[in-house]
Amino acid sequence: MSSKEQEAQKGKQGWITPAVIPPEEWGTFRYRGKTLEELLNLPMDEFIKLLPARQRRSLKRGLKPEHRKLLEKIRKAKRLAAQGKKVTIKTHSRDMIILPEMVGLTIHVYNGITYIPVFISPWHIGHYLGEFALTTKVVQHGEPGLKATRSSLHIAAK
């Protein structure tokens, strides 16, 4: 299989597979000078002060009911995971801000068609869930060549 065919195959599989950093390497993580353990121990109002303005403003207004429901699901999943049971967390809340207590979980985020599994690592903190489950896919053009444009589609046949 040529390299171009391999690239096209990767595009079909989903190109947004993020590089997953193993939990053993999470010790090097710092968010605004704080380690993950420090972030987990911070009260919510102190954590909010560390976020960028858009996320800070959103959380200061309070959580929406669907976000509260998602946090309850996450806490329940963590309790069940401690007992050895595996729970799938599915959500439509693409505008939920990733909090430190979500780290280490896989949350299935709806992209309009299917649920995309998103493994939450410390580097996702402060971002929105929807950023990691794209709603559109990369355009894969057909003949007469890779990355064909409209003008080059109408090439005269020999």
Swiss-Prot record:
Gene3D superfamilies (alphabetical): 30s Ribosomal Protein S19, Chain A
Annotated keywords: Ribonucleoprotein, Ribosomal protein, RNA-binding, rRNA-binding
MF term (GO), any: structural constituent of ribosome
Family indicated by similarity: Belongs to the universal ribosomal protein uS19 family.
Classification via Pfam families: Ribosomal_S19
Purpose of the protein: Protein S19 forms a complex with S13 that binds strongly to the 16S ribosomal RNA.
GO cellular component: cytosolic small ribosomal subunit
Gene encoding the protein: rps19
Protein name (Swiss-Prot/TrEMBL): Small ribosomal subunit protein uS19
Keyword Ribosomal protein found: yes
InterPro entries cross-referenced by the UniProt entry: Ribosomal_uS19 (IPR002222), Ribosomal_uS19_CS (IPR020934), Ribosomal_uS19_euk/arc (IPR005713), Ribosomal_uS19_SF (IPR023575)
Example GO biological process: translation
